[in-house]
C-alpha cells in the first residue's frame, strides 16, 4: 500500500512584438498553471493513477483586446491484478478547453484486459468505448490562432497475441 503526490505550480510572463498586416504589434502573454499527479496503491492488486493539469492564458495582442483561454486536462487510470497473470486497466480521459469564443469538452474511455503466461501473452483492448467521433480545439499563440481538428476511430476491439522467445 502506498500513496504518491506530485504538485507543480507555474507562472510565465512574456512580452514581444510581431509583424501584423505590415505593422509591428506588441503582445503579451501571462500563463498560470497547476499540475497534480496522484498515485495510490491501496492494496497490492489495485493501482489508482490520477493526473490533472489546469492552465489559464491571458493573451493581449492589441491595447484593448485580451483573450483568456482555459485548459483542463484529466486522466484517471485504474489497474487491477487478478492473481499473477491477469491484468485489467480502465483509462478515462477528459479535456476541457474554453475561451471567450468557444468551449470544447472531450471524454474518452478505453479498457484493456491482458493474460500473461510463461511463453505467450494474450490481450484484448477496447478503444473509444464512448463512441466519440470527432472534436476540435483552438490554441492561441502570441502571434497566431491554430485550430486543431481530430477524427477518432470508431469503437474498436483489438485482440493481440505475443509470443515470448
Question: Over which residues does each language-model region extend?
Answer:
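Exposed, low-structure sequence patches enriched in small/polar residues
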Residues: 1-165
Amino acid at each position: 500500500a502506498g500513496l504518491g503526490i506530485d504538485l507543480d505550480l507555474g507562472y510565465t510572463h512574456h512580452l514581444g512584438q510581431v509583424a501584423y498586416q505590415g505593422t509591428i504589434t506588441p503582445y503579451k502573454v501571462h500563463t498560470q498553471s497547476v499540475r497534480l499527479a496522484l498515485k495510490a496503491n491501496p492494496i497490492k492488486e489495485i493501482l489508482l493513477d490520477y493526473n490533472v493539469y489546469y492552465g489559464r492564458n491571458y493573451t493581449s495582442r492589441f491595447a484593448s483586446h485580451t483573450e483568456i483561454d482555459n485548459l483542463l486536462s484529466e486522466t484517471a487510470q485504474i489497474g487491477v491484478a487478478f492473481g499473477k497473470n491477469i491484468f485489467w486497466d480502465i483509462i478515462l480521459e477528459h479535456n476541457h478547453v474554453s475561451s471567450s469564443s468557444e468551449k470544447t469538452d472531450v471524454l474518452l474511455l478505453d479498457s484493456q484486459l491482458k493474460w500473461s503466461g510463461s511463453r505467450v501473452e494474450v490481450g484484448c483492448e477496447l478503444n473509444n468505448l464512448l463512441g466519440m467521433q470527432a472534436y476540435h480545439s483552438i490554441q492561441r499563440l502570441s502571434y497566431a490562432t491554430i485550430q486543431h481538428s481530430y477524427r477518432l476511430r470508431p469503437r474498436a476491439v483489438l485482440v493481440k497475441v505475443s509470443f515470448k522467445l
